[in-house]
């Protein structure tokens, strides 16, 4: 593995942070130091798994690269979004010709939406206690 070029990318979504390392290979997937046959085993859902690894499909690299993922924080949906952004950024480092394709599919923009904080006097961020007129 030392003779092959390693490309990395960092992605964030909500409170999740993902670091992705890609190496030319045969499609081996490692998430948090565990080898998985498919992403569905980790994300426990086909939709989230497809969402996370969509950059590979769009750039026709599915099964051509070994992917090493380190992801932490948040839930599975946030982690899938973080992996998607990190993977797209790593692919651009590998080959800059992928940039227009990934950009047109909206895979290079960091989703800025975060959970709104809870305010005092309210039950949740915006949910107010029930109002009684009399």
UniProtKB/Swiss-Prot annotation:
Kindly give the Gene3D superfamilies that the UniProt entry links to this protein: 3.30.230.10
Q: Name one GO cellular component term.
A: small ribosomal subunit
What is the native source organism of this protein?
Pseudothermotoga lettingae (strain ATCC BAA-301 / DSM 14385 / NBRC 107922 / TMO)
Give the family from UniProt. Belongs to the universal ribosomal protein uS9 family.
The record's section on Pfam families has:
Ribosomal_S9
Q: What is this protein called?
A: Small ribosomal subunit protein uS9
Q: What's in the keyword line of the UniProt record?
A: Ribonucleoprotein, Ribosomal protein
Any GO molecular function: RNA binding
Q: Name one GO biological process term.
A: translation
Q: Does the keyword Ribosomal protein apply?
A: yes
């Amino acid at each position: 593995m030392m003779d092959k070029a390693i490309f990395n990318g960092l992605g964030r979504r909500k409170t999740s942070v993902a670091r992705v390392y890609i190496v030319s290979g045969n499609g081996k997937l490692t998430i948090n130091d565990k080898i998985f046959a498919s992403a569905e085993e980790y994300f426990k859902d086909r939709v989230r798994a497809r969402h996370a690894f969509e950059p590979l499909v769009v750039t026709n690299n599915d099964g051509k690269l070994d992917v090493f993922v380190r992801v932490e924080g948040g839930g599975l949906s946030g982690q899938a979004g973080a992996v998607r952004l990190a993977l797209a950024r790593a692919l651009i480092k590998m080959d800059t010709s992928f940039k227009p394709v990934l950009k047109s599919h909206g895979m290079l923009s960091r989703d800025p939406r975060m959970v709104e904080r809870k305010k005092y006097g309210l039950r949740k961020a915006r949910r107010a206690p029930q109002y009684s007129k009399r």
